[in-house]
Amino acid sequence: DMGSWDIYASALVTAPSGDPQYFFTTSCVPGMSYNFGAYDNPEVTALIEQLSREFDPAKRGELAVTLQQMILDDNAYVFCSFLQMNMISKENVKNYTAHACDYYQVTVDLDIT
């Protein structure tokens, strides 16, 4: 029940594929799964729709920056931290490179000898 709390804290890996659309689609569109605060800005929703139809990486980046600023200006979200990750492996794991998004940690070069 969204009316029963004053503040909500959540941790979310926002870019499992390195693309910003996941966060905007799930958290900034009315009725979507992670939009717990019922955020609703028709201009933001329209830009998210535009983002879903845009395939040029540079234009997608520009749209993402614009969307970020709009939700910050609306005070829709307060981004307060970033998870510090620790990596531990056995000595026989070779070519493992830590990355801020776990999607990129398993590569063709990763090997267990």
Predicted regions, residues:
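Short, solvent-exposed loop/beta-turn-alpha elements that line the ligand-binding surface or hinge
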Residues: 1-3, 23-53, 82-113
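Periplasmic binding protein-like
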Residues: 1-28, 63-64
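Bilobed periplasmic-binding protein-like "clamshell/Venus-flytrap" ligand-binding domains
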Residues: 8-11, 55-90
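Extracytoplasmic/secreted proteins, especially bacterial periplasmic and envelope-associated proteins
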Residues: 4, 19, 43-50, 59-66, ...
